[in-house]
Amino acid sequence: WIMGHMVNEIYQIDEFVDLGANSIETDITFDDDAMAEYSYHGVPCDCMRWCHKWEYVNDFLEGLRRATTPGDSKYRKQLILVVFDLKTGDLSSSTAYKGGKLFAEKLLRYYWNGGSNGGRAYIIISIPDIDHYAFISGFRDALKKSGHEDLLAKVGYDFSGNDDLNSIRGALHKAGVKDREHVWQSDGITNCLLRSLDRVNEAVKNRDSSNGYISKMYYWTIEKYATVRDALNAEVDGIMTNYPDVIVNVLNEDSFKNRFRMATFDDNPWELFKR
């Protein structure tokens, strides 16, 4: 999965897919009532990127729905996975549940079209703070109570704060998420800084073990050719990047073209890939 980073305006969906992304990451900010308000990152953000692009969440979700609904004039077949980077910093552990409930209701209305012919992409709820695990509980409960529990088959979970893996596993369990139940594990840092692959290697080892909790592992945010090669050699499942074309180029190199391929809609993002 080539994951286009910080896609917060609708026009950027086409921009990143045209560069080779089959997945995008979108930042979601919340108002004082725990309601998702904007697709917006703000400062600081990655080097060489403009931090202030934004849409109203409802508008972005409708644009995203069109881009991922077969038959729509805006449909992009390649776009199969969306990571919502949830900026829950202004939520408390007590309002996180409400935030998750309201975000599920918003996705149901504006992205899934009330459960009728909505967008088809898989969704990852990515939360930076393990203390906000109740966001996941609220999200899941809202879909169940609305009679759309079936949509949870399209939803995965990630804690993105580079916490201890056992602590993340515990937070997932508190949220009601079982081991390997659609669990993506991220590791990374802004492209302005360097980061070792130590935790990536630890997460990959967990993913590949008989008693791990991780389904897939992705690394963010990289675009240097050497770093991309190192990440692929570490056997990650996804790479988040500002330059999808760089990842495409590396995948086409002799040492990788027979080991990796781009994921398609037929590849289940929740299944452990047996190497």
Curated annotation (Swiss-Prot):
Cofactor needs: Mg(2+)
Substrates-to-products reaction catalysed: an N-(acyl)-sphingosylphosphocholine = an N-(acyl)-sphingosyl-1,3-cyclic phosphate + choline; an N-(acyl)-sphingosylphosphoethanolamine = an N-(acyl)-sphingosyl-1,3-cyclic phosphate + ethanolamine; a 1-acyl-sn-glycero-3-phosphocholine = a 1-acyl-sn-glycero-2,3-cyclic phosphate + choline; a 1-acyl-sn-glycero-3-phosphoethanolamine = a 1-acyl-sn-glycero-2,3-cyclic phosphate + ethanolamine
UniProt GO MF annotations: lyase activity; metal ion binding; phosphoric diester hydrolase activity; toxin activity
Manner of cofactor binding, per the entry note: Binds 1 Mg(2+) ion per subunit.
Transmembrane segments: none
Subcellular location: Secreted
Sites where the protein binds Mg(2+): 25, 27, 85
Family in the record: Belongs to the arthropod phospholipase D family. Class II subfamily.
Protein name: Dermonecrotic toxin LamSicTox-alphaIV1ii
